[in-house]
Structures are given as structure tokens and as C-alpha cells.
């Protein structure tokens, strides 16, 4: 009976996972793209995987300014993390920051926010394209 209950609980947790995805093509000198987690400024949903795929023209970069990152601090990062992938260079953070800046090394940047079984943590940033 315990095994059946555990199997149902695990299946329910997996079945309830939420995935969101957005993409944007940024132009140097153009408008900023707002990156906000689901429910911001409230906590993001539990079991969330939210992805933002940002691109700009070849030879340019993507600059990110985050004014509100609140994730569980853990080493190594656990279930709550924000990942920056700029074409193979992957950085992961799980902390609180009100002034985090990141500039990609390529013309693409993929951000992924993931949350654990509790609805906790959120992210708010602005992305712009910058010339070399």
C-alpha cells in the first residue's frame, strides 16, 4: 500500500510540472525585453521550468540586468536555480540579488528558471542587445 501511495505521489508531482517558454529577437538600440517569472512579483509556481530564448544579430551580444532574483541559496544549486546559457557557456545561480548583470559571449542567451516542489522564488530582469 505504501508503495502504491508513493508511486501515485511521484506520478502526480511529475504530471503537475509546468513548462513555459518565451523567445525574443533583440535589436541593438531597440526596446528592452522584460524577463519575469510566472506570477511575479509573487512566488513562481511549484515544479516550474520557465525558459526565455533571446537572440540578436550576429556580432552582437545580449546584456541582462536583473533587479530582483530571489532563489534558495544552496551549494551546489538544488531545485531552485536560474541558468544562463550563452551558446555552451553555462552558469547557474541560486541566490538573492538585486543588481545582477550578465553579458553573453555570443548572440544567443537562454535563461531557464526552475523551481522545486514548493512555490518559492522569482526573477525579474531586462534584456537588451548591445553592439560589439
Curated annotation (Swiss-Prot):
Spell out where the chain crosses the membrane. none
Family matches, as SMART domains: CUB (SM00042)
- Which cysteine pairs are covalently linked by disulfides here? 66-125, 77-94
What does the entry state regarding organ or tissue expression?
Answer: Expressed by the venom gland (posterior main gland) (at protein level).
Domain CUB span(s) in chain numbering? 22-129
Please name the InterPro entries in this protein's record: CUB_dom, Sperma_CUB_dom_sf
Instruction: For this UniProt record, give its keywords in alphabetical order, as a comma-separated list.
Output: Disulfide bond, Secreted, Signal
Matches recorded under SUPFAM superfamilies: Spermadhesin, CUB domain (SSF49854)
One cellular component term (GO) for this entry is: extracellular region
Matching Pfam families, A to Z?
Answer: CUB
Q: Which residues form the signal peptide?
A: 1-17
Q: Where, subcellularly, is it found?
A: Secreted
| The family this protein is said to belong to | Belongs to the venom CUB family.
Name of this protein: Venom CUB domain-containing protein 2
Give the species: Platymeris rhadamanthus
Lineage, uppermost ranks: Eukaryota, Metazoa, Ecdysozoa, Arthropoda, Hexapoda
Amino acid at each position: 500500500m505504501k508503495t502504491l501511495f508513493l508511486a501515485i505521489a511521484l506520478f502526480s508531482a511529475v504530471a503537475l510540472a509546468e513548462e513555459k517558454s518565451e523567445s525574443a529577437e533583440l535589436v541593438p538600440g531597440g526596446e528592452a525585453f522584460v524577463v519575469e517569472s510566472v506570477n511575479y512579483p509573487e512566488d513562481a509556481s511549484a515544479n516550474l521550468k520557465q525558459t526565455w530564448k533571446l537572440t540578436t544579430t550576429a556580432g552582437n551580444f545580449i546584456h541582462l540586468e536583473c533587479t530582483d532574483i530571489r532563489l534558495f541559496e544552496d551549494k551546489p544549486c538544488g531545485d531552485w536555480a536560474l541558468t544562463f546559457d550563452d551558446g555552451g557557456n553555462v552558469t547557474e545561480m541560486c541566490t538573492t540579488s538585486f543588481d545582477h548583470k550578465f553579458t553573453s559571449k555570443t548572440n544567443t542567451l537562454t535563461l531557464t528558471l526552475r523551481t522545486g516542489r514548493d512555490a518559492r522564488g522569482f526573477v525579474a530582469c531586462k534584456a537588451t542587445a548591445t553592439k560589439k
